């Protein structure tokens, strides 16, 4: 079968190793190139080496890593009322709460010393510095004829580094002229930001089936090396939808449309390393053209 037009000269650019799998499982085998941004994370000293082992064994023939270090910004924005700034999502009081509760994949005992050593200003500065580093690293890789797949503007489940990567690539799209595509994952946490990208009319999109066997094979590779960052009970959706990503957020419309969303819920962990998710695999979860905003 011939490749879909959007998969010609195609590249997935994902923030963290396993993002390429979680949000692009239907196209992962068929894209021409995969680029992953981050390896090391100060709160998880082992994870960089583990990720490098996965990349070395990755079954796709063209996977590279930028080898950047995570900023630690995950969970640092107020997702009940997210504010976009030049670097991504504005970090704020949630930074304090995240450090005190050990919100991003770590227990209190292991995260707090590392975070306290650096401090809240360090996380903000690292997040801001990464914006420029991403621009410099990605600009020479991109051409006008490319189809670039990356995180959606709300960061799927509300991840600050996902939003930042989208905004970097959105700026480079305006500069270089490639097509920028996003997939359709969203959560209760990210919905306030996602709704700012709804439009007056639904746009065109492409729907593709998820290769669940291939996805699980790759998930097992991450699990083998101890760097699978997602819940063990995650269940793949049957399909994914892709559309060209909108640029500007706006105030939510009275009647807004986007495209079918793969909606799932996420609760903040209390004592577990992993985030708890509940996949809404019903028709309401995967086939709404507009969420609770249209009849």
How does the language model describe each region?
Residues 97-111, 117, 175-295:
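The feature marks non-catalytic terminal segments
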Residues 31-32, 57-65, 170-182, 202:
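Structural alpha-beta junctions
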Residues 150-155, 159-160, 184-185:
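Short, well-ordered beta-to-alpha junction loops that form the rim of enzyme active sites
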């Amino acid at each position: 079968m011939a490749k879909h037009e959007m998969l010609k000269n195609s590249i997935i650019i994902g923030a963290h190793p396993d993002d390429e799998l979680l949000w692009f499982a239907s196209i992962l085998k068929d894209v021409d190139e995969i680029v992953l941004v981050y390896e090391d994370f100060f709160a998880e000293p082992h994870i960089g080496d583990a990720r490098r082992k996965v990349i070395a064994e990755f079954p796709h023939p063209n996977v590279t890593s930028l080898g950047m270090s995570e900023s630690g910004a995950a969970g640092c924005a107020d997702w009940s009322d997210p504010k976009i700034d030049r670097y991504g999502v504005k970090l704020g009081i949630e930074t304090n709460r995240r450090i005190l509760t050990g919100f991003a994949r770590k227990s209190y005992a292991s995260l707090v010393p590392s975070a306290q050593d650096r401090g809240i200003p360090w996380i903000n500065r690292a997040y801001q510095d990464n914006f420029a580093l991403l621009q410099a690293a990605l600009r020479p890789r991109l051409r006008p004829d490319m189809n670039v797949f990356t995180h959606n503007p709300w960061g799927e489940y509300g991840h600050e580094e996902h939003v930042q990567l989208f905004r970097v690539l959105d700026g480079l799209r305006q500069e270089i002229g490639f097509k920028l595509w996003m997939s359709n994952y969203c959560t209760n946490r990210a919905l306030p930001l996602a709704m700012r990208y709804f439009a007056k009319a639904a746009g065109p999109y492409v729907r593709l089936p998820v290769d669940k066997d291939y996805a699980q094979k790759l998930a097992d590779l991450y699990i083998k090396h101890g760097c699978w960052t997602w819940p063990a009970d995650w269940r793949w959706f049957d399909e994914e939808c892709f559309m060209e990503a909108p640029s500007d957020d706006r105030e939510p419309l009275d009647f807004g449309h986007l495209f079918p969303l793969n909606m799932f819920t996420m609760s903040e962990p209390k004592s577990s390393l992993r985030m708890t998710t509940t996949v809404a695999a019903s028709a309401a979860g995967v086939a709404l053209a507009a969420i609770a905003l249209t009849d």
